[in-house]
Amino acid sequence: MDKCLPPLRNYPSKARTSFATHLNTVLDATADCLHRAGVPAPARIESTVNGVQLGQLPTFSGNAGACTSAGLRDAVENWGELMRYARCADGTACLGSAAGPCRGVLLFGGERLPGGQPRVTDADKLPANHYLESATLAALSSRQLGGLPNRVLIPFASRNEPASTDVAVCLP
């Protein structure tokens, strides 16, 4: 007699106890890489508001620079679409956060919000507001990130609910 397992969709990745830890490790390593690289300009700058440039992650070279780890490159390849990166255009620590002043911030967009944030076509995947919540964009505009979490937190009770809260990791 064959035993059938329920469909894989019944076991979302976030249901694994190691999921939040894995994502936090990826975010910490990526933030460290950006910091060691001197908080470089974002790739494809989407906007500059109140002196803060917002765009996509710069390309991490596999052969040189701060991001030579194959594990980091693989993780960024897998999760980079959900990340955005912002920095103070003048190089100062113009962003305030619970961790202190920041020259930049690595942003990780949570699951898409119901009824919005399309991410199907290549064009859908470009706008930051298809990944980041309006509260995150407002925090960037005001240069105050203190109200945003700096870690991925998935409490056991909500593992089957959308994890839509964005994460902001300060780059001092």
Predicted regions and their residues:
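Short, surface-exposed interaction loops/tails
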Residues: M1-P172
